[in-house]
């Protein structure tokens, strides 16, 4: 426990974990923007906190996440770095974060480069996971905006 109190946050912010992502992970606070949510999700992967990964995915997608596979992957992965390349506000409710996450598996360092979509629902930011089944373009958007998917999140993926 003391290690977490004195350790730098895995999100690479340079801050102590307890003053950075820990309040998010413990749901004492919520990230104010998509970039902070991205950093907190990276830290959650580094700390193998898959519950947080699920909780910060769009609520309509949470039941679709392969939780056991995510946990297995996290258990086999060591996260070694995060570079936020760009944070773009697309609208009041949508943002994109481009990042590179560096990780090691079986003593081999790899990089995951992604442009992620985030949506703000009821004053909280969530990750839109493109790897799970998505609505078709004419169905209601998964974020609950009452728009068709193609005119909301689907048009941004």
Curated annotation (Swiss-Prot):
Pfam families: SEC-C, YchJ_M-like. It comes from the Bacteria. HAMAP family: UPF0225. Belongs to the UPF0225 family. This is UPF0225 protein PM1617. It comes from Pasteurella multocida (strain Pm70).
